Each structure stands twice: as structure tokens, then as C-alpha cells.
Amino acid sequence: MNTLDKILDNGIIAISRGFYEEKLMKAVSKLIKGGIKAFEVTFEQGGDDLRTAEAITMLKSAFGNECAIGAGTVLTKSQLELAHSAGAEYIISPNTDIGIIRGTKELGLVSIPGAMTPTEIVTAVDAGADAVNLFPAGSLGIDYFKAVRAPLPGIKLFAVAGVNLSNIADFKRAGACGFGISSSLFNRKLIDEGKFDDLEYIARAFLEQIGF
């Protein structure tokens, strides 16, 4: 199974922002038990890019045979190259940057950039994107997603940001092929309190909402 197929298997990408070392490993382990098969480790703008790369390498080494590991919030060529060197299998950005998209494909990685308008979505695909994140989906809403999706049925469109247990099924029915979910899965309060088992149950709840 190739990287994109792994991601699309159930469509959920769990997004880790600001978790490292033991907390990250424990959280990912439980989310995998809950059925999650794709993880995104985000670069923190103004943060330590090397630390993000180390987290990607750590996850790839421990869980690479079970799931797809990617890098998120990739905004610069140096971050792209660092993510590739760290072992990232796919690259996610919040924006439509033709240079990043083309650079990602030149490295043989899956490209999933962010976009908000039909023009941006088509521009991303024309540049080589394998799929596109509609971002921020929660703020834009289900009706907006449907309206954008209707004239672009052949494009793989993810719903990212603001996706939760209350609306994920609606986005699925609206035509989303996948979902980027951060704090609802990487719940900071539960992780800080060491309640990692709860993450497994939350993951299962999300999958149940979309028929898994």
C-alpha cells in the first residue's frame, strides 16, 4: 500500500502540534490502537525545526510499518528538505505554494497543500498536488465545502481545521475524502494528565462517525 492509499484508508490524519519525545510516542501509540493510520508532525514557525525533524524520525522508526508519517505547516524549502531527510512520507502546508508542491513531488513525496478557493485548489492540482486540504474547513462550513466540491468532483479534498465529532460525518457526506484533526485527537489536557488510554477511545469514536 502506497503512502496516499494509507492515508485514504480511513482518511483521518492526526495532527501533532508541540508534542515531542515520550508524550508524542505514547499518544501516537494509543491513537494507532484506536485505528488512526496517518500522522502529521507540524513545524512551529519561530520554533525549533530540528526538533520537529527529530520527532518525525522517531515516529517513522517506531511506527513507520504501521502508518504514514508526514510533516505539516511546511512553508519553506529548508523545512521541506529537513522533513524529507527526517523520513517524512508526505508534506502538508496551510497554503498553496507552487514551489513547495513541485519541490515535494521532485523528492518523490506525497503533496497535500492547503487551499480555500476553487482557484487555489485547481492551481495546487495543476502544480502536482496529490490531494488538497480545504482550510480552514470548520470556519468555512459544510455548505461552503459542498459548494466548492460540486464543480471539482475529481479532486481529492480533505477537510482540515475545526473538524470534530459533531461535524465529521457531515463533511464525509459532503464529499471529503479525508480529515485533518489536531486538538480533538492530540488532546493537550488528556496528554498532560497522562490519560493516554482516553485517546484510543476518542479515535474509535471518530472512526465510528465515518463508518469504520
Tell where the protein language model's regions lie, with residue ranges.
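Active-site-adjacent beta->alpha loops and helix N-cap segments on the catalytic face
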Residues: N2-T3, Y20-K23, F43-S61, K77-E81, ...
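Active-site mouth loops of central-metabolism enzymes
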Residues: I7-K23, C67-G72, L109-G114, I155-F158, ...
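Conserved, mostly hydrophobic/aromatic
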Residues: A14, L31, A83, A124, ...
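Catalytic domains of carbohydrate-active enzymes, especially glycoside hydrolases
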Residues: S29-F39
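Structural motif
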Residues: G34, A86, L107, A127, ...
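Short helix-capping segments at alpha-helix termini
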Residues: G34, S61-C67, L152-G154
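Short acidic/polar active-site loop segments enriched in Thr and Asp
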Residues: K37, E89, D130, C177
